[in-house]
Amino acid sequence: MADNWNLRGKTQMLDDLNTPSLQCRVYDRIAVQDSMGKSHFYCLELSAGNTFDFGFCRKENVPSLLRDVMTMGSIRVLSGICDDLMVPTVPTVLWLKQARKYDPKHVIMWLENSIELTEEYKDTILRLRKMGMRFDVRVDAMGEIASNDEILACIDYLMVDFKRSAEFMTVIQSLRNKNPHLKIIAFKHHISIFSFTKEESRNFDYVLGTVNNFLLTYEIERPKWQHEMLRTFAQLYSSIYDVKEIGVIVANYPLMALAMKGMVASKHLTNLTIRKNSSTLGESQTLTQFDLRNFLAISVGYNLFTLTEKQSYEQKKIPFSSEFINYEPFILALNFAKIVDLMAQDICDDITAPQAFIAGFLRFAHVFLHDTEEATFAEFPLDAVASCYTNGGGQLGSIIRILMLLFEHRINDAMDVANNAGLVLVKERLYGYISHAMAWTDAVCSALNIIKGQQEE
């Protein structure tokens, strides 16, 4: 199997990964944010290669985790706009043997629930701690850690179930008396585009999931520029648009112009865009008209999201700076749309497949508008713009529903939709789509300067 995280398009054959159950694959990554929506690091969701189940990387999968995921190149992609990465796994001695291949100072190990502290695990934790690694554990599943002061002193973060946080506050305070630097991270069992409100997140140091943006309120109707962006979205999807008219719109919005300039100029993004899947290059080595149309759609979404964010701050009379922008919802939209695009290229016909990226991107229209789904799609009904959102929606509609359910961790529901639509979900391909989409999204964010100061690959 090819190493899907190699960012320069090369492949490395991994002859010893013929057993899917021993492979470690990235199912998802979730931002860990503060109450203002600033992402401090990402938490990986890992899966064995033979299943869509996710969670901790088991001991037998750690060799694959360190070889395939914890490389310098893949860590940089997975870290995205942050510097650090949280990895749910067990502290085997292999982490020490492979420490030169990654930087322990930028890794937070989320220790397995109710972990049994073997001599191997204790020694590894203590030695990794000296190298700068940080550790996290669930407060309701500390196992032997709670009674081992030496290991407890290595813990930097405590995870707590949001719904049960009140009942654990006494325990948390007791642990903080022993270890004052402990930070509390709240989590929910359900994942959505926005997992926490600002009010919910204020009671914790961090939350696992995206904090909602300020919603924009309207006195009578939306600003003219929002209507113009929504109309442009619809025109781009339909492919019925005047290039000169689009050019005028881009010229009138500096953010759109900067976005297009950055994306078109990025050789790395071009390379990732023209790749038909995660391991091979397409025959064409240049961007197609559909690729450029997708770039235009991204520039529309970026402009709409950023200007609306600015106006929402102004409405609340809060000083605004681009440094305050919580881009995570926009990043989620990019990543989701690209996975839809990659899956559609393998499944849909040549007429439908080119529509896939924008169709998936439009699923996040309410995010760009800083509005509720109900209000947005009542005014901007997706089924009126894209046929894949009508009843049934064909293969593309099924792909979007399946991937949205997988994104929300509703695995059984996703499998039911796939079976009813006659689609076979090949695990190896899906994990390939995910890894390719993350690398591509990272390249887009760099081109848009959402990831600051990153050099062209």
Where are these regions (language model features)?
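The catalytic core of metal-dependent phosphodiesterases that act on cyclic dinucleotides
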Residues: K101-N213, T352-Q355
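A generic secondary-structure signal
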Residues: D68, M72-V77, R127, S174-L175, ...
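Generic recognition of flexible, low-complexity loop/linker segments
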Residues: I75-R76, S147, I246
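Short phosphate-engaging motifs
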Residues: W95, E167, M256
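Short loop/turn motifs at secondary-structure junctions
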Residues: K38, C82, A153-C154, E200-N203, ...
